[in-house]
A protein has these predicted regions:
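Ubiquitin-like/PB1-type beta-grasp interaction modules and other compact soluble beta-rich domains
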Residues: 1-85
Length: 86
């Protein structure tokens, strides 16, 4: 039996820049690192942007750094662009 893929979501601005405007993806991965690798496979070079330019929320809980954070089947993984300040 196949597990329900995670729902990976990007903001509109981020998706315009890196994924041709696509804001949602269904990705099968057990950890956040697996999600990032899968997205990098779909869009080469995207993994670096995800690691450097975003914070991630998994099922509504924000994780600053968490490559090994578990991603449960059916989870929502939302990449939030970091806000730069001055």
């Amino acid at each position: 039996m196949t597990e329900t893929p995670a729902r990976v979501v990007f903001t509109t601005g981020f998706s315009r820049r890196y994924t041709g405007g696509v804001t949602e993806f269904a990705i099968e991965a057990k950890t956040l690192r697996g999600v990032i690798k899968a997205m990098d496979t779909l869009y080469p070079g995207l993994g670096e942007h995800l690691e450097e330019e975003t914070t991630v929320a998994i099922d509504g809980e924000i994780h600053e750094v968490g490559y090994f954070q578990p991603v449960k089947p059916g989870a929502e993984v939302f990449f939030i662009p970091k806000i730069e300040g001055g």
